[in-house]
């Protein structure tokens, strides 16, 4: 199981990303807009505003974790579980529709 502090840190990042998502998106849209081209100085001002946002509010800082164990690796997006937890739950028939493979 992952350390509690790492799980809490990831939750904090998710909250920050949700809080600043619209602001970040609008600033990026302004920079990329081809309808009204911006001068170089205007673009740098917008970039400075982007850089002034908290680092942890960037979506690239987020990492998927297993919601049961908090494990950061080998996660299946469909279930939100890590591989070994998924395997155990399938063996115990706790996931409807998921079956063990046999050939």
Swiss-Prot record:
GO BP annotations, alphabetical order: translation
Alphabetic keyword roster: Chloroplast, Plastid, Ribonucleoprotein, Ribosomal protein, RNA-binding, rRNA-binding
One cellular component (GO) term of this entry: small ribosomal subunit
Molecular function GO labels: rRNA binding; structural constituent of ribosome
Membrane found in the keyword field: no
Annotated InterPro entries: Ribosomal_uS14 (IPR001209), Ribosomal_uS14_bac/plastid (IPR023036), Ribosomal_uS14_CS (IPR018271)
Main location class: plastid
Cellular location(s): Plastid, Chloroplast
Matching SUPFAM superfamilies: Glucocorticoid receptor-like (DNA-binding domain)
Subunit composition and interactions: Part of the 30S ribosomal subunit.
Family under the similarity heading: Belongs to the universal ribosomal protein uS14 family.
Function: Binds 16S rRNA, required for the assembly of 30S particles.
Name this protein carries in UniProt: Small ribosomal subunit protein uS14c
Taxonomic classification: Eukaryota, Viridiplantae, Streptophyta, Embryophyta, Tracheophyta
This protein's encoding gene: rps14
